[in-house]
Amino acid sequence: MGVQCVDCVREQAKGERRPVTVLGGRAGADKPYLTMAIIAICVLVWLGEQVSPRVFQEVAFAPALGPSEPWRLLTSAFAHSPNQIMHIGFNMFALWIVGGYLEQMMGWARYLAIYLVTALAGSVTWLLFQPVDPSDPGAYTPIVGASGAVFGLFAAVIVLNRHLGRDSSGMLAIIGINAVLGFIIPNVAWQAHLGGLVAGALVALALTVARSRRSPVIAWAGILGVLALVVVLAVGKYALSPTGLLPLG
């Protein structure tokens, strides 16, 4: 037992190293609170869709809406089909399994970054295969779902586990099965899965390089680099459309 002044404790804390994860990120809480928060948001949005169709209409992404409402590229990743409970059920189960694992491994900041970047990459990759001309009815086909981000996390697990000498055979099997199902089950945006996978692998690769060289700057440079590439692809898609690039914003 003893008494310490507040200033003494503060000065002592300055000299202590903050705990970090195995990948050099800032360690978070013992429980995957960020993963739980993302799941809660998705569930609340889905419940809102049950109450009013307007919720789906306000957050879903359609190619023709991208130039005027670009935030839909990201908000659509927090919504799911209101008529298919298995859609949100599978995505949230997968997110809980891999999300909690990665959150503890990467730290909450890097984990949030990879989730958002891969979610955006999934939407943009799907966009690349769609018509964007407002005069084309297909340009108003909506997309929702967190699967782009989930597949991005799948890829990150494989890359990071390989770097750390851990087994990922089970994850490879899951990706293979879902890749086949994407071509068998109708209305599955396999393009979003592909975009998320590639983006997740690239970001995870940057994290492994950052760990090897003990340079957090490399990790964030990699994350921002993938984000920049995704944005360029989206802008390029609209710029090369028959109607030209519409103002983003």
Model-derived features: where do they sit?
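C-terminal transmembrane module of polytopic alpha-helical membrane proteins
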Residues: 1-27, 183-249
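N-terminal TM1-TM2 helical hairpin plus the immediately adjacent luminal interfacial "cap"
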Residues: 31-144, 183-191
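Residue-level signature of the transmembrane alpha-helical core
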Residues: 43, 88, 116-120, 149, ...
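Alpha-helical transmembrane bundle and helix-membrane interface signal
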Residues: 104-105, 157-172, 208-221
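Central hydrophobic cores of alpha-helical transmembrane segments
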Residues: 115-118, 170-179, 221-227
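Membrane-embedded alpha-helical segments of multi-pass transporters/permeases
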Residues: 124-128, 165, 201, 205
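Alpha-helical transmembrane segments
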Residues: 133-134, 147-166
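Membrane-interface loop-to-helix entry segments
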Residues: 139-155, 190-198
